[in-house]
């Protein structure tokens, strides 16, 4: 008896410590997972915070109440499987959650007025109910923003595992409640801080918060799209010869059960790639088949064993954890790391061995078997008299339970069992062996699915009769068709089937036929399982024929009824039901499911394979894929271009999870290209530092000092080649800049519009204006010539690379891949056609020689052929702005000017008509002036000669210079008289200086020399004047 209070407290404290030591880890786990229930921030928690900030404390508490109620229902559903399946079925959540979130975002995306920003102060407000329901439904749908739902699954797993432990349940509830209280307090604290510390009006702050949360909800929608399973249809190869099978495969998804009709259960989770070293043979050092399982070391019974179902993520995490904890320093070998667990298992095994050894020793010492063998716990009650027999004790099994003695004497058999016939015994045994089938059948009927028979149920009378007719028809057809080509004719084992018995007189040549024969012999009726074993084509034929027979039966019954045969009046109800259900799908349902099997040879070639929809691995994006036929042999050449854009799907196995792909890290909000994490440091380094490092490796001083060598090097390079390379690089850069879907879409439409406007709008208008203006200028119009040249212009649609496709048809995927438009013989508007002018000029310039006259007699046909043969092939590419280039994305081609020939012709006529007349007038004036000064010039030359003799030395020196100049100009003095030549070759004779004899000598002088002659005469006159002044 406890007499001291301290002793009482010490006992209680010891019990509490023992409870804590026993259930301490569970309490900690419960608190942790209770807090972690509210840790994954989903839309429900976001709505709660939004309600606190925008609509006050009351609406925030109601939103948090809805979230809490949703969490509570989810936790309770763990212990009730129908509710758990209804709430957490992934495919149903996929189809419900996303539309609901999008609808909610559409409601809150725009703020029409400030009414939603007012605080809610009453529970009677309709907005309270709306907030509560939205928060509750978002929590029920259970979407979270974390990339992996492992945390929430661990909570459910631990709660289900330790639900019998009150400490864990209480601690989990306390942690969950504490997490929600913490969320409430943090939301209120955030609300107070925003109200007190905002520099602007709180109403404007609310507007910003409203807009921010609408963006957050939209981002949550996008994140759900990446995490939810997406409907994915597997492509199946169909045989062109079997059209019926192809149709059945196309409609097979209608007959699949939910959710396999929309969702792909064959989707890869952790796909593997097989890399081949040789493209032409399978003989490579790499093993041919790769396992789809991951092998790793695990512990089992105290030993390390190889497990083939290990998770790669767990193995990688374990290795990283060992490296982080530096296990090699703690223990020299990996065995010591698990030594404690191995020792525990070894102790348990040793205890078991020692216990068995002691029991054997007890038997040797004379103890009975009952005392030596371990006593089993039995079923009993308080009254020892009510202890049941060991035969009926449910806690005992094996040898401890009594055996019911079964007498082998036929005298103990009942009359009923003794009088059974052989057939009844077989039927009794079949029923005994098929208890499971009977139980399933009874449950199936209770579920009100009587119209859907089970595989072992017999066929109806109509179905049996149709099957017999069908098989007989196929047997008759077999005698006409070769047996090797008809697969269905091999299954002749069901030919002699009647309504009650099946005759085994048929040949079994295939496994399927053997199975049917065994079923027919073993059972006395035809069931739906026999129909299930038919091929797909045979089943479709059977059910179509069965439907036709139903219609015929209904028609015949109504005909009998109308004709007066009232024997079928009692079956009118069944006939109406048949008419109502005639178009329903077949009542046959297959009780089998295909196991997802993936190929173990996913080949990853070294080169990019051009195969759209054939390979299992996504290859590089191909643009402008087509075929080009060249040569006389008409060989098909593949024309393709790989996209220059970064491909985020390249080398990704179709249907696999995108988040599992390595080496495509995305660390920016908007990232244009994919990068490997290995090169992150290089790509993030600024270009300035990289350029300085490159410049440090170059000898800058030597490069700039040795300028002569650089000039020689540049001179050796071909300027033309450098220009071609530069333009090609520029064109490729422009093409890559345009190579993304939105730009290709806009550019392609612009090209088509420009082509149409040029061909049918702009050029016809210019031709009409030109010829009308020629009519106003009293010139002959050139309608035929212009329209002929316009009709020669052809617009050919090409791919983005410039490969010609067709004049009328557009390339495939032209909106996505882009296109080019090539103009052959582009039309240029001319002011006149040069053929007429050339003919006129040739007629005037050609002399009248006999051989030239014969040439002029060339026929018009030969002339047209010669012109067509000598015609140069011209083409250009149209740009999106209407210009022309020689190559795609090349420099703009300079077009011939329309006004330049006109201006040139006007200049020629100006010189010929006006300037020639003014030159003639000037020459006439010049000749008259020469005649007037003829005598005066000769007398002045004589005065110069006399003056040269009488002047002093200084003047003689000057005169000698003048004479030298006159001699250099071609003048000479003779004794007979003064005879001088002008610098232009004009002879002036003093004795015979009659200009009338040589009136046309000036016409022989060139035009330029006439102006020089006038200048020399002026200089000569100025010299004479200066000498006269000196004298």
Swiss-Prot record:
Domain of life, per lineage: Eukaryota
Stretches that traverse the bilayer: 11-31, 68-88, 92-112, 127-147, 166-186, 212-232
Membrane topology reported for the UniProt record: Multi-pass membrane protein
Keywords: Chloroplast, Membrane, Plastid, Plastid inner membrane, Protein transport, Transmembrane, Transmembrane helix, Transport
Primary localization: plastid
Any one GO biological process: protein transport
Cellular location(s): Plastid, Chloroplast inner membrane
Family under the similarity heading: Belongs to the TIC214 family.
Purpose of the protein: Involved in protein precursor import into chloroplasts. May be part of an intermediate translocation complex acting as a protein-conducting channel at the inner envelope.
PANTHER family attached to this UniProt entry: PROTEIN TIC 214, PROTEIN TIC 214-RELATED
Name of the protein this chain belongs to: Putative protein TIC 214 N-terminal part
């Amino acid at each position: 008896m406890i007499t001291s209070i301290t002793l009482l407290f010490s006992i209680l404290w010891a019990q509490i410590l023992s409870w804590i030591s026993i259930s301490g880890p569970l309490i900690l786990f419960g608190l942790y997972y209770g807090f972690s229930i509210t840790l994954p921030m989903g839309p429900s928690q976001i709505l709660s915070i939004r309600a606190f900030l925008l609509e006050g404390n009351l609406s925030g508490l109601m939103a948090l109440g809805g979230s809490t109620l949703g969490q509570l229902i989810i936790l309770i559903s763990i212990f009730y499987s129908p509710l758990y399946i209804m709430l957490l079925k992934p495919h149903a959540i996929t189809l419900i959650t996303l539309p609901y979130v999008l609808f909610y975002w559409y409601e809150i995306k725009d703020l029409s007025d400030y009414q939603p920003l007012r605080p809610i102060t009453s529970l009677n407000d309709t907005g309270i109910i709306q907030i509560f329901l939205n928060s509750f439904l978002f929590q029920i749908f259970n979407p979270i923003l974390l990339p992996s739902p492992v945390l929430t699954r661990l909570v459910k797993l631990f709660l289900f595992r330790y639900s019998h432990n009150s400490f864990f349940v209480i601690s989990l509830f306390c942690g969950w409640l504490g997490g929600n209280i913490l969320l409430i307090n943090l939301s209120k604290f955030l609300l107070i801080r925003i109200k007190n510390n905002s520099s602007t009006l709180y109403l404007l702050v609310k507007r910003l918060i409203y807009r921010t949360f609408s963006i957050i909800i939209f981002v949550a929608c996008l994140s759900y799209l990446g995490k939810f399973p997406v409907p994915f249809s597997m492509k199946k190869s169909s045989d062109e010869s079997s059209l019926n099978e192809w149709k059945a495969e196309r409609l097979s998804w209608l007959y699949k059960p939910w959710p396999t009709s929309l969702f792909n259960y064959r989707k890869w989770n952790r796909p593997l790639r097989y890399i081949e070293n040789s493209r032409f043979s399978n003989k490579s050092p790499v093993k041919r088949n790769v396992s789809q399982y991951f092998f790793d070391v695990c512990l089992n019974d105290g030993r390390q064993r190889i497990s083939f179902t290990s998770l790669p993520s767990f193995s990688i995490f374990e290795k990283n954890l060992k490296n982080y904890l530096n296990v090699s320093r703690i223990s020299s070998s990996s065995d010591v790391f698990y030594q404690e667990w191995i020792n525990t298992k070894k102790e348990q095994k040793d205890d078991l061995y020692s216990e068995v050894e002691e029991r054997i020793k007890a038997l040797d010492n004379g103890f009975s078997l009952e005392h030596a063998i371990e006593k089993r716990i039995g079923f009993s009650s308080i009254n020892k008299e009510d202890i049941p027999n060991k035969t009926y004790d449910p806690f005992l099994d094996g040898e401890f339970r009594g055996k019911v003695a079964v007498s082998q004497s036929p005298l103990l058999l009942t009359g009923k069992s003794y009088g059974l016939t052989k057939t009844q015994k077989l039927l009794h045994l079949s029923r005994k062996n098929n208890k499971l089938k009977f139980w399933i059948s009874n449950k199936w009927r209770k579920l009100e699915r009587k119209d859907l028979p089970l595989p072992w149920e017999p066929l109806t009378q109509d179905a049996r009769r149709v099957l017999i007719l069908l098989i007989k028809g196929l047997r008759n057809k077999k005698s006409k068709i070769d047996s090797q080509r008809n697969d269905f004719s091999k299954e002749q084992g069901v030919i002699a089937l009647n309504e009650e018995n099946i005759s085994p007189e048929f040949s079994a040549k295939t496994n399927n036929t053997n199975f049917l024969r065994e079923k027919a012999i073993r059972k006395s009726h035809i069931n739906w399982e026999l129909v299930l074993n038919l091929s797909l084509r045979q089943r479709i034929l059977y059910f179509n024929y069965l439907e036709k027979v139903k219609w015929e039966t209904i028609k015949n019954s109504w005909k009998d009824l109308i004709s007066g045969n009232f024997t079928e009046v009692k079956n009118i109800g069944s006939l109406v039901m048949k008419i109502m259900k005639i178009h329903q799908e077949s009542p046959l349902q297959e009780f089998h499911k295909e196991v997802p099997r993936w190929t173990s040879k996913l080949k990853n070639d070294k080169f990019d394979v051009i195969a759209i929809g054939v390979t299992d691995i996504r290859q590089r994006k191909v643009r402008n894929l087509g075929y080009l036929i060249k040569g006389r042999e008409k060989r098909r050449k593949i024309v393709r271009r790989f996209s220059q854009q970064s491909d985020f799907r390249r080398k990704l196995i179709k249907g696999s999870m995108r988040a599992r792909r390595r080496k495509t890290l995305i660390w920016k909000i908007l990232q244009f290209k994919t990068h490997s994490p290995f090169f992150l440091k290089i790509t993030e380094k600024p270009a300035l530092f990289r350029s300085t490092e490159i410049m440090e490796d170059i000898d800058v001083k030597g490069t700039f000092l040795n300028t002569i060598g650089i000039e020689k090097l540049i001179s050796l390079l071909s300027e033309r080649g450098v220009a071609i390379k530069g333009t090609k690089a520029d064109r490729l850069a422009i093409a890559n800049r345009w190579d993304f879907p939105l730009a290709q879409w806009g550019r392609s439409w612009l090209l088509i519009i420009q082509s149409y406007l040029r061909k049918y709008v702009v050029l016809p208008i210019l031709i009409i204006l030109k010829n009308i203006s020629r009519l106003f200028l009293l010139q002959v119009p050139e309608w035929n010539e212009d329209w002929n040249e316009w009709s020669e212009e052809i617009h050919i649609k090409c791919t983005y690379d410039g490969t010609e496709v067709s004049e009328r048809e557009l390339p495939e995927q032209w909106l996505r891949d882009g296109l080019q438009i090539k103009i052959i013989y582009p039309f240029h508007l001319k002011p006149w056609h040069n053929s007429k002018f050339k003919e006129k000029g040739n007629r005037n310039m050609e002399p009248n020689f006999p051989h030239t006259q014969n040439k002029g007699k060339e026929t018009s046909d030969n002339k047209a052929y010669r012109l067509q043969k000598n015609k140069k092939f011209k083409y250009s590419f149209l740009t999106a702005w209407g210009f022309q280039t020689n190559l795609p994305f090349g420099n703009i081609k300079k077009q011939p000017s329309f006004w330049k020939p006109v201006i040139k012709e006007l200049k020629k006529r100006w010189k010929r008509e006006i300037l020639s007349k003014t030159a003639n007038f000037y020459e006439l004036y010049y000749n008259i002036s020469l005649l007037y000064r003829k005598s005066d010039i000769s007398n002045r030359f004589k005065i110069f000669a006399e003056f040269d003799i009488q002047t002093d030395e200084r003047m003689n020196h000057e005169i000698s210079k003048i004479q030298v100049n006159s001699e250099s100009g071609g003048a000479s003095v003779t004794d007979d008289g003064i005879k001088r030549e002008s610098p232009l070759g004009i002879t002036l004779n003093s004795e015979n200086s009659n200009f009338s004899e040589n009136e046309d000598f000036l016409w022989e002088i060139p035009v330029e020399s006439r102006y020089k002659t006038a200048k020399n005469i002026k200089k000569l006159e100025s010299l004479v004047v200066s000498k006269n002044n000196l004298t």
